[in-house]
Amino acid sequence: IKYSLGFTSPAPRDFVGTAPLSAPESEAVFNFTMKHNFALTLSYHSQGEIIYWKYLDFEPQKSREIAEYFGQISGYAVEETPYNSGFAGYKDWFIQYYDRPGYTIEVGLGQSPLPLTQFDKIYSDNVGILKGGITEI
């Protein structure tokens, strides 16, 4: 979908590739995921202090409950993925393929790349998500 929206050539953001798994790093993440039995996935991006938790109509069991927990411990808003932001992300594929929870965590405020001065707050906001991703599911 992003390709059809005009993101058709390599760029610092929003280019999704010419085809699924066309980039070596995408293939590496895919292969790594296929070799493990992950209960959930966390994808980190840097903009907005938001947790995106579902993909289209896919809502794996407990995914909303876990998202709310992550939002509570981080202070981040919990939202559904905007339509134009879906379709090419690791989280989206993971949710659809495995029917397990996946989250995109948007850290920090401002335009990416974020300043290093935000690191301590981002870490403080997210350490509970990282621990919770291991222990609270």
Model-assigned labels for residue ranges:
Residues 32-36, 69, 73, 129-136:
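Structured segments of extracytoplasmic/periplasmic soluble domains
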Residues 82-102:
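Short glycine-rich, acidic/polar surface loops and turns
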Residues 114-137:
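His/Asp/Glu-rich mid-to-C-terminal helical/loop segments that flank catalytic regions of hydrolases
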Residues 24, 28-31, 61-69, 85, ...:
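Extracytoplasmic/secreted proteins, especially bacterial periplasmic and envelope-associated proteins
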Residues 68-82:
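Short, flexible loop segments at boundaries between secondary-structure elements
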Residues 1-60, 68, 104-114:
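Active-site/substrate-binding loop(s) of hydrolase catalytic cores
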